[in-house]
């Protein structure tokens, strides 16, 4: 591994302890035109106690695939902020949505459209829980911890594994977990996955638009923590060909009616609605997902919709406990690890709760290529 790529956090520590003299640092984070994250920091004169106190900002969109060079200013509108686990103190990390200079949402800003659906269906109290899988690579783009020029033993001992040779980079995973907890994210768990150096964290339950906000912020923290360890994060749904599991972002969903006794009826109704829009959902469920949804490695076929109780080879899984109790939630196993959560939660709300006149998540996705 290239040692120079790893941050010198021990040297940095003495500077982090310096008095900021009443000012704070706000790190603005946004989604660029490639589905990746960007950020930059600015000084504010006092501690922030409300989102309304945060100023709008701008950046060069021609350098992020979000605007042409002749009209490159893109505006950052703060939508959420969190305690900064890296700078700590009163410093914050700000999630910002991107808007063009005419006030319209940038074509890669899918939050704006999804928020309309959640506002229209506020009384449904739709909850989400996302299971974010990802793969670790070293600075030479080899899977982290794998034998150089070779492969580890076949899958089997790695899922929720314990012990050297079964899990890799647990220190980095733990650091990310703690960073999310410090920032107040609803991170609900972590585990090693089926393929060695593949991990998962879960965020939720979160209501409506907050789900997308929190997943993006958890991803940002993951990348930042990984910087310090000299590790690259991949959200590709099939980072390695062959007999290795892919990476998904299983999406757990419930409405207020589903969570109440007798809610199974509403779960079944939702699954029926989802079956009729399978192709539309797949379109929004991540790029290269065809490499993952093969019907093997705990996935369903990409071309055929299916559902079942406790069946991890189906499109929609109803947990055994939910089937037994008769209410709860369902899991959509189709989304890939590289999804935009605003697209996925938005179309889920649209399908399950109902379409509205001024929002269309399929057309929203198609704006990217316009």
Swiss-Prot record:
This is Glutamine synthetase. Present with 346000 molecules/cell in log phase SD medium. Homooctamer. GO terms for molecular function: ATP binding; glutamine synthetase activity. Its main location: cytoplasm. Coiled coil: none annotated. Belongs to the glutamine synthetase family. GO terms for cellular component: cytoplasm; nuclear periphery; nucleus. It comes from Saccharomyces cerevisiae (strain ATCC 204508 / S288c) (Baker's yeast).
């Amino acid at each position: 591994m290239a040692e120079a790529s790893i941050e010198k956090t021990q040297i940095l520590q003495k500077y982090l302890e310096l008095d900021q003299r009443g000012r704070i640092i706000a790190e603005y984070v946004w989604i660029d035109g490639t589905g990746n994250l960007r950020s930059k920091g600015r000084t504010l004169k006092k501690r922030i106690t409300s989102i309304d106190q945060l100023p709008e900002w701008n950046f060069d969109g021609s350098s992020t695939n979000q605007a042409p060079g002749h009209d490159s200013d893109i505006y950052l509108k703060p939508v959420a902020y969190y305690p900064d686990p890296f700078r700590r103190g009163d410093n914050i990390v700000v999630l910002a949505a991107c808007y063009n200079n005419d006030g319209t949402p940038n074509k890669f800003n899918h939050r704006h459209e999804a928020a309309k659906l959640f506002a229209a269906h506020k009384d449904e109290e739709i909850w989400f829980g996302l299971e974010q899988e990802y793969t670790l690579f070293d600075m030479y783009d080899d899977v982290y911890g794998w034998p150089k020029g070779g492969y580890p033993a076949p899958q089997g001992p790695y899922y929720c594994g314990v012990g050297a040779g079964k899990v890799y980079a647990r220190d980095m995973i733990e650091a990310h977990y703690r960073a999310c907890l410090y920032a107040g994210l609803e991170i609900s768990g972590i585990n090693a996955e089926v393929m060695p150096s593949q991990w998962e964290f879960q965020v939720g339950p979160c209501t409506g638009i907050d789900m997308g906000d929190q997943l993006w912020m958890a991803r940002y923290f993951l990348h930042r923590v990984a910087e310090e360890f000299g590790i690259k994060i991949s959200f590709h749904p099939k980072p390695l060909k062959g007999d290795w599991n892919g990476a998904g972002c299983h999406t757990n969903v419930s409405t207020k009616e589903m969570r109440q006794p007798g809610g199974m009826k509403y779960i079944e109704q939702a699954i029926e609605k989802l079956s009729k829009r399978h192709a539309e959902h797949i379109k929004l469920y991540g790029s290269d997902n065809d490499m993952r949804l093969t019907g093997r490695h705990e996935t369903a076929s990409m071309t055929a919709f299916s559902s079942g109780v406790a069946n991890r080879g189906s499109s929609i899984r109803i947990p055994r406990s939910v089937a037994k109790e008769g209410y709860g939630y369902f899991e959509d196993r189709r989304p890939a690890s590289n999804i935009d959560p605003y697209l996925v939660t938005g179309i889920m709300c649209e399908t399950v709760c109902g379409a509205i006149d001024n929002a269309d998540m399929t057309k929203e996705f198609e704006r990217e290529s316009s």
